């Protein structure tokens, strides 16, 4: 709505409607939508939700889950290397496509299936598991293989994010398990849904007119957007929505 009010046009109206339906993830070129709305990521998430029964079927047992993960990874590689060619119109295929990000969802499912074993290993081998995750994280940035192409980026990110999930599942480290993270977790959905609106508000201030350094501009923007999103989410959840739900419950 903010985008439509700021830049009113028939194109903005069409794109706003596509965003509201939450089905825009099925559009082959929805990554070019200029009305940011809830963002491309939520488009992928809702495609995943619609396919969730099939995902549960694939994750029914460990053998099927591993086969599904391998097949999805191979299909993603083929999509990035073959179906993006001139033969198929040279249409860009990236993380806006559910087939490309399917390995991420399935790797998360695999981590869930092995959560007991993961917790046992990480808790008993805290130092070793911490070192392994740290080494993988450092290698990702020190040896940026992902710069070689989309396939390399896909494979390295799947490995990196999977290692983070594995360590997070089993750790009781105060860095991740504390009052701050629990508080942010309680309003994480509200933060996600509102952060682009806050970004639009920050964008209107035109900080770039006053801050010329790109790195500093990025840091300031992140702080303002995250701080604004947290404040907005807190007010909405613990004050406004709380009053609305209490009013509705009084009518029962």
Show which residues each predicted segment covers.
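Aromatic-anchored segments of alpha-helical transmembrane domains
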Residues: 25-27, 71-84, 132-145, 197
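Transmembrane alpha-helical segments and their boundary/interface "anchor" motifs
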Residues: 1-22, 46-48, 100, 129-132, ...
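Interfacial loop-to-helix transition and helix-capping segments at the boundaries
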Residues: 30-44, 83-107, 139-164, 191
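Hydrophobic alpha-helical segments with transmembrane-like composition
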Residues: 6, 20-82, 232
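Short juxtamembrane and helix-loop transition motifs at transmembrane-helix boundaries
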Residues: 2-9, 24-34, 84-91, 111-122, ...
């Amino acid at each position: 709505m903010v985008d439509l009010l700021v830049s009113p046009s028939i194109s903005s109206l069409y794109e706003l409607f596509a965003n509201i339906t939450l089905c825009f993830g099925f559009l082959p070129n929805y990554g070019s939508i200029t009305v940011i709305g809830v963002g491309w990521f939520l488009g992928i998430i809702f495609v995943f939700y619609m396919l969730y029964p099939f995902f549960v079927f694939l994750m029914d047992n460990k053998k099927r889950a591993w086969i599904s993960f391998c097949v999805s990874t191979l299909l993603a590689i083929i999509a990035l290397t073959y179906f993006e060619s001139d033969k198929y119109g040279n249409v860009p295929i990236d993380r806006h496509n559910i087939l490309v990000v399917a390995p991420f969802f399935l790797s998360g499912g695999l981590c869930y299936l092995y959560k007991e074993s993961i917790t046992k290993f990480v808790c008993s081998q805290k130092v070793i598991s911490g070192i392994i995750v740290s080494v993988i994280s450092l290698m990702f940035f020190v040896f940026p293989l992902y710069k070689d192409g989309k396939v390399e980026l896909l494979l390295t990110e799947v490995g990196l994010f999977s290692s983070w999930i594995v360590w997070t599942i089993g750790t009781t480290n105060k860095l991740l398990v504390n009052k701050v993270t629990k508080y942010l977790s309680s309003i994480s959905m509200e933060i996600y849904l509102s952060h682009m609106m806050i970004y639009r508000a920050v964008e209107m201030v035109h900080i770039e007119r006053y801050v010329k350094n790109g790195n500093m501009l990025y840091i300031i923007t992140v702080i303002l957007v995250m701080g604004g999103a947290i404040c907005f989410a807190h007010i909405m959840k613990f004050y406004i929505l709380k009053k609305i739900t209490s009013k509705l419950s009084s009518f029962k």
